[in-house]
């Protein structure tokens, strides 16, 4: 159950229509998870400073069980997500940061319990 959060200082008017659906599909492919399990949040218009600059930038936060826990996994994921984001948002790679957060099943609540018991 991946959670993907895109935070950017780009205004909402510069976010391509349907980005949430394409980011969901890309995440499912990249992380090899079912698309109906991916949760996407996009936060445009944020106040962000990166590398001492307020030029357009983005932070991508990816949390998931079992697929973002090693450097080898995340190197591959990072390459794919960077390709997606640079194309979709027209940002250079040095204006994007990705943070990976491995989760345990007991850290996600669903259907009145936690994933451990589902």
Swiss-Prot record:
It is found in: Cytoplasm. In all organs tested, highest levels in liver. The keyword Cytoplasm applies. Its EC number is 4.1.1.84. The modification Phosphoserine is found at residue 90. One of its GO terms (cellular component) is cytoplasm. Homotrimer. This is D-dopachrome decarboxylase.
